[in-house]
C-alpha cells in the first residue's frame, strides 16, 4: 500500500503532457505545474538527460541539478570503447546510433551551460565528496520537480522522500520503481513485511 502523499490522483487528459523520449526516459506530467517549476533535481543520470533538455525548451529559465556518482571519466571511456566496437560490428548503422557514439560532447555542452552534475551517490548518509542524502539536497529548495531513477535504490531513500514531502512544495515527483530492490531479501517474508509497513501511514 502506498502512503497517501505518494498515491496518484486523477488529472484530465488535456492537462497532461509527455516530456522526453517516447520510450524509456520520457514521463507524463501535469503541464499546469511547468510554469511553477524553478528547479529539477535529477537523482540518477546515466547517459540520458533528454527529459531535462525537453523541459528546458518549454521553460528555459529552469535550473537542472543532477546527482550520479557512476557518471565519471571512466564511464565515458568505457562507453566510447563499447560504442566503437559496436560500430565496427555493424550494430550502429542508423544515424541516431552513430551520433550517440559522441554523447560525451552533448553531456559537456549541457552541463556547461548553467546546469550542474554532482558525482555523488544518493544515500542515507552524508560522506564528503562521496555520498549525499536527499535531506541535504533539498534543504534550501522549493517549487521543484524531483526525478529519481537510481536502479533499485529508490526504496532505500523512500522515507527521505516522504519526510521532505511534508516540508517542501514539490510540483511533481517522478520515480521509476526498479526491481529487484537493492538490499531486500526476497526469501525473508518478515523483512518484506517490515519494509512495506515502514512506509504505510
Cite the ranges covered by each PLM segment.
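A Trp-anchored, charged/polar loop motif used as the substrate-binding/catalytic surface
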Residues: 128-136
Amino acid at each position: 500500500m502506498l502512503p497517501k502523499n505518494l498515491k496518484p490522483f486523477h488529472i484530465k487528459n488535456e492537462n497532461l503532457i509527455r516530456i522526453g523520449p517516447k520510450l524509456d526516459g520520457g514521463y507524463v506530467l501535469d503541464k499546469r505545474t511547468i510554469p511553477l517549476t524553478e528547479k529539477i533535481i535529477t537523482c540518477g543520470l546515466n547517459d540520458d538527460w533528454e527529459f531535462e533538455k525537453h523541459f528546458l525548451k518549454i521553460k528555459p529559465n529552469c535550473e537542472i541539478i543532477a546527482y550520479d556518482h557512476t557518471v565519471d571519466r571512466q564511464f565515458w571511456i568505457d562507453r566510447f570503447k563499447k560504442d566503437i566496437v559496436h560500430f565496427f560490428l555493424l550494430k550502429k548503422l542508423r544515424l541516431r546510433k552513430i551520433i550517440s557514439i559522441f554523447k560525451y560532447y552533448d553531456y559537456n555542452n549541457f552541463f556547461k551551460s548553467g546546469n550542474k552534475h554532482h558525482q555523488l551517490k544518493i544515500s542515507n548518509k552524508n560522506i564528503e565528496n562521496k555520498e549525499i542524502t536527499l535531506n541535504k539536497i533539498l534543504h534550501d529548495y522549493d517549487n521543484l520537480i524531483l526525478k529519481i531513477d537510481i536502479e533499485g535504490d529508490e526504496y532505500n531513500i523512500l522515507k527521505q522522500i516522504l519526510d521532505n514531502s511534508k516540508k517542501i512544495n514539490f510540483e511533481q515527483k517522478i520515480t521509476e520503481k526498479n526491481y529487484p530492490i537493492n538490499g531486500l531479501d526476497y526469501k525473508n517474508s518478515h523483512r518484506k513485511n517490515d519494509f512495506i509497513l515502514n512506509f504505510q501511514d
